[in-house]
């Protein structure tokens, strides 16, 4: 279950399905990925589908995980006690 968001606007998107910071072509896919995160009880629940490209992050993001949304867009988060914390949407360049 998603417990906390690192970005207040992403939490607004979670509740409304719209936000000016989310490109319209990304909205439906982002909702599906966030639903998947909300249902997950362990990071292993996110290994399928393979398009998630679940991976542990390193360096300054040590302890975080990421899944692919589309193109260079990723959802980054911490997973603890079966819950998602500090969820954020980032675009890698």
Where are each of the predicted segments found?
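Basic, amphipathic alpha-helical segments enriched in Lys/Arg and hydrophobic/aromatic residues
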Residues: 34-37, 41-42
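Arg/Lys-rich, positively charged N-terminal/basic patches that mediate binding to nucleic acids
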Residues: 1-33
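A short, surface-exposed loop/turn module that caps and links secondary-structure elements
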Residues: 42-65
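Glycine-rich, flexible loop/turn motifs
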Residues: 1, 9, 18, 42, ...
């Amino acid at each position: 279950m998603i417990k906390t968001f690192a970005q207040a606007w992403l939490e607004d998107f979670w509740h409304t399905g719209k936000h000016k910071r989310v490109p319209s072509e990304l909205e439906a896919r982002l909702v599906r990925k966030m639903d998947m995160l909300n249902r997950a009880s362990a990071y292993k629940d996110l290994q399928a589908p393979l398009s998630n490209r679940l991976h542990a992050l390193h360096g300054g993001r040590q302890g975080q995980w990421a899944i692919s949304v589309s193109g260079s867009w990723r959802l980054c988060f911490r997973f603890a006690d079966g819950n998602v914390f500090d969820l954020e949407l980032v675009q890698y360049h």
